[in-house]
Each structure stands twice: as structure tokens, then as C-alpha cells.
């Protein structure tokens, strides 16, 4: 059977069972709370274990642990992009994402994945709070911070940063 035929059969089955995905509004609200640094809303979401309430989220794996791990990766990727859009330095956001996805790999239970999700969400939220506080920094200082994150393993001098920002030393 071709993938196209298999997809068609799955669609027929889902429509007969009236399997529907929930509205993404709740997810978007969570992502926006993280992006805006609303720690109170994020803590409330985590304390209510919204992450492991999967009704209407779609089945990404028939194995419950693998399914929640896939949802973790999706959530982490979305939070990363929302936070970058909100002003978090891209390299920092991607490294944080990689860190948590690698940590998730070693989780053995759904509870461990959920607890790690909550830590990850609060970590991204905390970074957004700090980012907003640091937004009072000048553009050249922020350009330097971005450059340093992107070239973290290289030797960086004041002259290199001056050249990068177009300022003199």
C-alpha cells in the first residue's frame, strides 16, 4: 500500500471516529506566556499538568512514553521560536533547546518528562524576564552579546567587537 493510500484510509478511519484535534488557542496562550515572561501563568499551567493532558493533541506514537517525548520536542521547538521572536538571542535559545531535548532523552517515565517540561518552560520564561530587563542596553552592546554567543569558542578581542559594531576602540 502506498503512503498516499495509507493516509487516505487513516483519514477515513479518523472521520468515522470523529477524531478531532483541539483548538491551538491553549497552546498559543502558553507559548505567549513564556515569550512575555509571565512566570505566574507558566507556573499555573505547569502545576495543573496541562502538558500531559493530551486529549485532542494527536497521537505521535502508540507508545505513551514516546508520544509524550515527541510532544516535548514539539513544545521545546515552539518555545524556542517564540522566545527568539520575543527577543531572546537565537544561539542561546537553540542551545537551551538542545540541552533540554538531550536531557529528555534519558527520561524513563511520563512523570519525568512532564517535570523536565515544567523546568524547561520556567527556564525559558526566566530567560525572557532577564532579556526584557536587559533590553535597556544599547544596540552596540546587544550586537556584541549576539556576536559573543555566535563565536563563543573563538578568541574575541575588543577590536573584533568594535569592527563588528562599526565603532572605534
Locate each region found by the language model:
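Hydrophobic, helix-rich cores of sensory/ligand-binding and other regulatory modules
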Residues: 1-127
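Conserved short strand/loop->alpha-helix "switch" segment adjacent to the catalytic nucleotide/phosphoryl-transfer site
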Residues: 64-66, 132-137, 154-156
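Generic hydrophobic/packing signal
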Residues: 80-83, 144, 161
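Short acidic alpha-helical/loop segments enriched in Asp/Glu that coordinate divalent cations
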Residues: 90-95, 136, 157-160
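Basic/polar phosphate-binding segments, predominantly the helix-turn-helix DNA-binding elements
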Residues: 131, 150-169
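N-terminal positioning helix adjacent to the helix-turn-helix/winged-helix DNA-binding module
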Residues: 136-144
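Helix-loop-beta hinge of the Bergerat
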Residues: 145-149
Amino acid at each position: 500500500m502506498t503512503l498516499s493510500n495509507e493516509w487516505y484510509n487513516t483519514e477515513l478511519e479518523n472521520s468515522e471516529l470523529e477524531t478531532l484535534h483541539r483548538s491551538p488557542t491553549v497552546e498559543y496562550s502558553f507559548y505567549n506566556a513564556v515569550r512575555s515572561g509571565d512566570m505566574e501563568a507558566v507556573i499555573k499551567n505547569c502545576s495543573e499538568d496541562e502538558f500531559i493532558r493530551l486529549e485532542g493533541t494527536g497521537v505521535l506514537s502508540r507508545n505513551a512514553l514516546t508520544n509524550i517525548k515527541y510532544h516535548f520536542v514539539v513544545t521545546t521547538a515552539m518555545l524556542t521560536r517564540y522566545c527568539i521572536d520575543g527577543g531572546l538571542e537565537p544561539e542561546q535559545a537553540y542551545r537551551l533547546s538542545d540541552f533540554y531535548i538531550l536531557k529528555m532523552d534519558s527520561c524513563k517515565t511520563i512523570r519525568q518528562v512532564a517535570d523536565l517540561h515544567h523546568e524547561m518552560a520556567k527556564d525559558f520564561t526566566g530567560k525572557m524576564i532577564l532579556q526584557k530587563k536587559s533590553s535597556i542596553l544599547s544596540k552596540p552592546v546587544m550586537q556584541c552579546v549576539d556576536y559573543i554567543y555566535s563565536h563563543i569558542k573563538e578568541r574575541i578581542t575588543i577590536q573584533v567587537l568594535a569592527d563588528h559594531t562599526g565603532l572605534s576602540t
